[in-house]
Amino acid sequence: MSNDHRNLESEMPVLPNGPINEESNAIDPCAREFVAVQGKMQQEQPCHSVQADFERLFRAEESSEQPTTVRRELWSYYLYYNGDNGVGPGSYTQALFQWALNGAGWQPGTNPRKPCSNSSPCVVPWAGGTRSVSSVVLIANGLCFAFMTVIFVWFGSAADYGSFGRWLLLVLTVICWCLQYGMMAIKRPTQWPAAMGMYVTAYVAYGATLVFYAAVFPRLARYMPHVQKAREDLKNGEINQEEYDAIESLERNHISNIGYLMTLLINLSVLLPLQHTNYSNNLALCLTNSYWVILGIWWFIFQQRRPGPKVPKGSNYATIGFKQLWLALREVRSLPQTFLYFVAYFLLADGLNTTGTLVSIIQNNHVSFSFLQITYLGITQSACSIASTFGFWYIQNHFKIRTKRMFLVTNLFSVLIPLWGMWEFYFYNVVFGLFQAPYYAYAQTMVSELMPLGYDNMFFALFGITNRASSIIGPNVIQAIINSTQNNWMGFPFLFSICVAAMIAVAFVDVEKGREDGRRFALARTTTRLSDESSLDVGKNGFYTTVGEQSNDSGVNGGIDGISYR
């Protein structure tokens, strides 16, 4: 055996249970152990580690040669985001569904049955008994979030591999488009079961498009030309990691903060001349959906191909999500700040999503399901949204304020909504636009800052699960309260309490520590992968070995005495 090979062995001390981890002086039971057999170095009893499983299932390798984000791709992203604004599936469709319910219902305790008024309690037949209209709408929302959770667990992580994410977003988008056009057929109150089915399915597809589309923006921002230059400056030591993180974070906020005023203004062209026509609401929904189709199609044309790696062996697109979720829960200690944020956001999303639904139910009753009045309220909200998103972005950019601080400011005012109850609907939409629009932007920016590089779809899927799964709880609790009291306002105290608890938890999230945890997380798993793939050829003496993590990198691409590393 050559002196060089002896030196290699001396740098990789071996004990009966594996090499020593030099940093902790602890024995690593899953490190590789080597012996010489018939002139070759062989590994004894390979260890199957959780970390190796994690690397194999999670790591979606991102090549540094990914295409640079170009202007038409960026603007097609803006246009899709603008079209996928929720006015159709989240506002108009729910209002049409609630209109059908209200028309089919009656005032409880009346005989003969009296039709529901805007201010009276209203019940509909449900499972052999009766249930309030507000309760049924909240049940439908709970079903939406339950189905979304299943989708995110099932397919969320699979979007990291190959071109699956690209095609998944296309399919979900087309489903949502078709069902919104289908809602145009809802003309009579007796059609409320069909309206409920289409509303739930369309809203599930819409919610899923938001999550899988949001997973694109960290990579889109990362490959903006000036962000790429900043990454090169970081490699060359011209800027530090903190400065680079600030540049990338601000670009993420810039891409995510887009309003949706135009779709509501366009709808006025239908709603104003046809405001006394019953079918005007359906036409407005058609116009809203067509607006999304016209703006959204360009993303699927101009999006550049950035395929991920192949699905790991032993997994497929249908199973990898469940495997990853199980392993992610086992690895929770590796990213404590990220998962603390997920817990906080679980509560916050539950409170604010359910608050929004409850306010919409009350608001729809108050305006007698008039799409024109709903549009005026939406214009108020979206105008404030546009002003606030760009205003918040300017303030953050000018004063170099961290995302967490901006997020806490938006949280403070958002929490006031369930505290007050917000019966003044125009003022509610002003507050919502000014503070909840940037809240959503900062919420997804926070998770993008806390997640390890290369695990975008997986962590955005977990983020989506946190957002949607949490909202299974709120609607079910609130619908039970409302059904028992026949008073919509009694749901707000519960919502306020969980929002306050969430805000306190967010305050304890250390973003800098979480970002560093994410780097170590990705580096450790990349090191494991490279260690598994690296090998050593000893051409002179005929040796071949696979080198473990404790090997030295000296001699790479050349070596001494015929030794070459690869």
Please identify what each model-predicted range represents.
Residues 212-219, 361, 441-450:
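Intracellular helix-loop hinge segments at the cytoplasmic ends of transmembrane helices
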Residues 2-73, 184, 188-190, 194, ...:
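Intracellular loop-helix junctions on the cytosolic face of multi-pass helical membrane proteins
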Residues 457-483:
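A late C-terminal transmembrane helix in Major Facilitator Superfamily
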Residues 404-440:
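C-terminal transmembrane helical hairpin of 12-TM major facilitator-type secondary transporters
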Residues 91-134, 357-374:
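Short amphipathic helix-loop junctions that connect adjacent transmembrane helices
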Residues 167-182, 405-419:
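Structural signature of the two symmetry-related core transmembrane helices
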Residues 148-164, 387-404, 482:
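Helix-to-loop junctions at the C-terminal end of transmembrane segments
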Residues 97-99, 156, 266-280, 393-398, ...:
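Transmembrane alpha-helix termini and helix-breaking/packing motifs in multi-pass membrane transporters
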